[in-house]
């Protein structure tokens, strides 16, 4: 079973990202589950959401403590929350940050999701950008399934722009992979 933990701030779309990822995995023929972790959070407060993906039914109903992957929508959370907590030894982090990040022993992939979101959406809402990057880094879901679910989640022009943002992030990761 693959377990993913999302870190974001209230209003950034971490919960929606976890749900879209689960639906894209289902679209690809996997079993999946997504759920949020809420306390008394308000807009701007740190939030977590989780996705599990497997080839067999997912029966666990508790938060993810030892993720295979961590997706961080807001770089500032690295200084506020231990986003690396419980990450498996071979775990991978996808971080919204322009430039490199020194994660010590942790494998961190960075992408300027905020820049892509501003360019495509005109707003710094990065959840779909980060999903495109995640798909590119991990290959756990196909970009086609991801884009299909994004368009179903956000109909019309908003969906088209979010799909474009996800594809841009995916292609940026692919370029980095080719140039490695």
Swiss-Prot record:
User: What keywords were assigned to this record?
Assistant: Oxidoreductase
Main EC class of this protein?
Answer: oxidoreductase
State the Pfam families in the record. Answer: POR
* Name of encoding gene: porC
Q: Which EC number applies?
A: 1.2.7.1
Q: What is this protein called?
A: Pyruvate synthase subunit PorC
- GO MF, one annotated term: pyruvate synthase activity
Q: Establish whether keyword Oxidoreductase is in the entry.
A: yes
What does the annotation say about its assembly with partners? Answer: Heterotetramer of one alpha, one beta, one delta and one gamma chain.
Gene3D superfamilies under this entry? Pyruvate-ferredoxin oxidoreductase, PFOR, domain III
- What domain of life does the UniProt record list for this protein's source? Archaea
Upper classification of the source organism reads: Archaea, Methanobacteriati, Methanobacteriota, Methanomada group, Methanobacteria
* Reactions catalysed: 2 oxidized [2Fe-2S]-[ferredoxin] + pyruvate + CoA = 2 reduced [2Fe-2S]-[ferredoxin] + acetyl-CoA + CO2 + H(+)
Q: What InterPro entries does the annotation carry? A: Oxidoreductase_gamma_subunit (IPR051626), PorC_KorC (IPR011894), Pyruvate_synthase_PorC (IPR053412), Pyrv/ketoisovalerate_OxRed_cat (IPR019752), Pyrv_flavodox_OxRed_cen (IPR002869)
């Amino acid at each position: 079973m693959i377990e993913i933990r999302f870190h974001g701030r209230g209003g950034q779309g971490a919960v929606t990202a976890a749900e879209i990822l689960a639906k894209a995995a289902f679209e690809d023929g996997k079993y999946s589950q997504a759920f949020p972790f809420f306390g008394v959070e308000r807009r701007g407060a740190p939030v977590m959401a989780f996705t599990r993906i497997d080839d067999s039914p997912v029966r666990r109903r508790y938060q993810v403590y030892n993720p295979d992957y961590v997706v961080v929508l807001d770089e500032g959370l690295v200084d506020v929350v231990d986003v690396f907590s419980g990450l498996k030894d071979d775990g991978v982090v996808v971080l919204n940050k322009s430039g490199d990040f020194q994660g010590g022993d942790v494998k961190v992939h960075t992408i300027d999701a905020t820049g892509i979101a501003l360019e495509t959406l005109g707003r710094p809402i990065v959840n779909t950008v980060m999903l495109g990057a995640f798909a590119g880094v991990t290959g756990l879901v196909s970009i086609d399934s991801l884009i299909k679910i994004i368009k179903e989640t956000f109909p019309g022009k908003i969906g088209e722009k979010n799909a474009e943002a996800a594809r841009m992030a995916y292609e940026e990761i692919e370029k980095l992979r080719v140039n490695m």
